[in-house]
Amino acid sequence: MEWLYSLFIEHSALQAVVVLSLISAIGLGLGKIHVCGISLGVTFVFFAGILAGHFGLSIDPQMLNYAESFGLIIFVYALGLQVGPGFFSSFRKGGVTLNMLAIAVVILGTFLAVVCSYTTGVSLPNMVGILCGATTNTPALGAAQQTLKQMGLESSTPALGCAVAYPLGVIGVILAVLLIRKLLVRREDLEVQEKDDANKTYIAAFQVHNPAIFNKSIKDIAHMSYPKFVISRLWRDGNVSIPTSEKIIKEGDRLLVVTSEKDALALTVLFGEQENTDWNKEDIDWNAIDSQLISQRIVVTRPELNGKKLGALRLRNHYGINISRVYRSGVQLLATPELTLQLGDRLTVVGEAAAIQNVEKVLGNAIKSLKEPNLVAVFVGIILGLALGAVPFSIPGISTPVRLGLAGGPIIVGILIGTFGPRLHMITYTTRSANLMLRALGLSLYLACLGLDAGAHFFDTVFRPEGLLWIGLGFGLTLVPTVLVGFFAFKIMKIDFGSVSGMLCGSMANPMALNYANDTIPGDNPSVAYATVYPLSMFLRVIIAQVLLMFLL
């Protein structure tokens, strides 16, 4: 039986791998069980870790710290990499509003924590720990402990408060999302949102009556116009054609245009007249040319095209084809000449069969090559993220510098590389399954270590009178701000439920609740909203944990 002892009990690298794998496997297995329609998924790994720690299972502290940190880093970086392409565009679609709402969650929770500390007699260091647990924010806990050390005070007291409040901190956000869904969200809300996400482009028909564009090429007209558009068909003298950018537009031409719905009015002013909403008019057969054409979706797989402008390829002029749409990470984009291509983009190409074959050679369309992992961007991003997280930021009035830490730095760099990497010709593409695998692996490691560390003293603290008080306070600090702000965001501000859920999860730094939201809400809105508010929320949480101790102790 000595080999069993060395495998499960005696501290070693092998024992650490076995214990963490066992906790993760049990937690993930139990996480698939549905109770009242709810399953905790990967979150159950945390509770499996607590149980293992309670029964005396442990691993080497340095191994524990390494695995916990590395798991968190992998998770947040992969998340940033996934949502990066849609992150900055989200600021034009309500991202500022989402961040303001997230700040409201942070401020409301902090205010309640200070009030509870003075009214219940719980010491401020313990209350800061409870607040960190209620918001599932271990970087803030680390910042608070570092501040206490620098002030010459006991630094271990907040950790137990965090561990006691953490489980209901995880569940509290899930309950808030579930409560808002049950009370306010209709099935049609989710269906409409799913439909809207799949149709971001708009097809309209116009007739040319504006003298300012008579006898001008499509390229010249595009340079004159702010709204972006693609002319996919041109009807002239009873014939339909696919125009190139050099095609001259004449009075009376009828155009089938792909644009965004909000730009349709501006294009009506540009061209002169918008046709009936139903662009399939009886007097025009826009599909007449289709007997000679085929439509095919081609994937960009040639690395040298990564970061190039679509217009620089001059595909329409060289091959007489039309690119109507581009799909990227599940988002439908307008195929404008200024669009920067990324590896993995899927282009809808319309043209003759021979021309499409030539375009296929230009773009690559070798889907198998995309399955090869691009790990350089992952490791470079992690290094840069950790470097950013270690940079001290001096805040006026605070003696201790503030740092973004292991979570804040990598997610910001992940977002930046996911967004701007292709423009620097850095290959950042990963398949959705590979990204999900990285995130799930990182989160499982992080939660297993967190639970194992908290489990040793968890039940002893919980069943003491002050432990029950801490649990109640932590649950209140989780539930009250999220429900109030979530209700306001969905009911008053009319923000879609997916974005509200992601905002609440991000403002509470709760990746486990995000995992639940992603499993139950269609589309990527929860992940995009989470990444939109997470960096600022994390930064504020870390600052506030230090500010409270410095100014109120």
UniProtKB/Swiss-Prot annotation:
Cystine crosslinks: none
Keywords: Cell membrane, Membrane, Repeat, Transmembrane, Transmembrane helix, Transport
Cell compartment(s), UniProt: Cell membrane
GO MF term list: monoatomic cation transmembrane transporter activity
InterPro entries in the cross-refs: AAE_transporter (IPR050144), RCK_C (IPR006037), RCK_C_sf (IPR036721), YidE_YbjL (IPR006512)
One GO BP annotation of this record: potassium ion transport
Limits of the RCK C-terminal domain: 190-273, 281-365
Topology in the lipid bilayer: Multi-pass membrane protein
Transmembrane annotation, as ranges: 13-30, 37-59, 69-91, 98-120, 157-179, 375-397, 402-424, 436-458, 468-490, 497-514, 529-551
Single GO cellular component term: plasma membrane
SUPFAM superfamilies: TrkA C-terminal domain-like (SSF116726)
Pfam families: Asp-Al_Ex, TrkA_C
Keyword Membrane: yes
Family: Belongs to the AAE transporter (TC 2.A.81) family.
Cited PANTHER family: K(+)_H(+) ANTIPORTER SUBUNIT KHTT (PTHR30445), TRANSPORT PROTEIN YIDE-RELATED (PTHR30445:SF3)
Name used for this protein in its record: Uncharacterized transporter BF1818
